Structures are given as C-alpha cells and as structure tokens.
C-alpha cells in the first residue's frame, strides 16, 4: 500500500493503492453498507442507517459521522455531479459554516493497477487549517478502507 498526500494552495491531493480491483473499490464509495465500514477519520463511525446514497447524476450522497465517545455528529450533505463507473466519482459537498467550510468538491479517480486500484482523490477548496484536518481525516478513512479489503 502506497500513499502520497500533497496540497496546492487550497486543494488536497491524495494518491493511494488499494489491494482490490477498482470495481470493488468504486463500489465501496456507493454502497451504504460498505461506506459504513470505512468512511470517516479514525475514531469516527458512519452508521448504516444514517447513510443515503443514490448512485446517479444528481443523486444524494449523504451521511452522518459520529465522533467517538462524545457522540458528536457531523452531517455531510452532498450531490453526485459526475459518475463514470468504475472510473470516476465527483461529489459536491454543501457548505458547513459551523466548521468554517464553504462548498467543496471531492473528485475520486479509480485506476486499474495490475489487479489493484490506484485511487486519486482531489478535494477542496479548503483554507489551510481545514485542509490539514481533511488530509488527516482522509488518511484515517483510507486506512479503514484498506482494512475492508484485507479482511
């Protein structure tokens, strides 16, 4: 498993290789049951019953992340704006003013890598502090996603 994270002025860019075919990694982003197993930073959960995904252009991509023992809830409301199975998913995320975030866009590319998947995520725009937090959050989520495929 390899990972590279870079930041431009306001965008986060992460590349990571997962030990599963891209069709399976792609599905993990659109199947609520699978999303509940990995989405969110380390210490967060995303309960299955709080996830709504409509895998089509304009479809909802929404979930609630619950933070640790404090049970603090963080709701994400997004729409699918590009969808090319199993190659590309782009979601536009509503603003979260209470977290100091405007509208962001998450672009996820899925590339075949000899039976594995090279995932390329571009996310933002973020101001510096939120971008650093988002990078840490994605790293934790991707660790959990990797464990889904490694049993």
Where are the predicted features?
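Beta-strand/loop substructures that line and gate deep hydrophobic ligand-binding cavities in soluble
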Residues: 87-140
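Vicinal oxygen chelate
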Residues: 42-47, 69-77, 92-99, 127
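Hydrophobic ligand-binding cavity/cleft-lining segments
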Residues: 1-46
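Hydrophobic pocket/interface hotspot
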Residues: 25, 35, 61, 80, ...
């Amino acid at each position: 498993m390899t990972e590279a994270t870079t930041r431009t002025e306001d965008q986060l860019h992460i590349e990571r290789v997962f030990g599963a075919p891209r069709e399976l990694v792609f599905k993990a982003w659109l199947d609520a049951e699978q999303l509940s197993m990995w989405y969110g930073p380390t210490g967060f959960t995303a309960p299955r019953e709080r996830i709504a995904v409509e895998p089509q252009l304009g479809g909802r991509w929404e979930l609630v992340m619950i933070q640790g023992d404090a049970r603090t809830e963080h709701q994400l409301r997004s729409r699918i704006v590009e969808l090319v199975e199993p190659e590309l998913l782009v979601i536009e995320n509503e603003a979260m003013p209470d977290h100091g975030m405007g509208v962001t866009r998450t672009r996820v590319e899925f590339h075949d890598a000899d039976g594995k998947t090279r995932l390329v995520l571009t996310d933002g725009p973020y101001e510096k502090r939120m971008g650093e937090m988002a990078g840490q959050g994605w790293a934790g989520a991707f660790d959990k996603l990797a464990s889904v495929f490694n049993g």
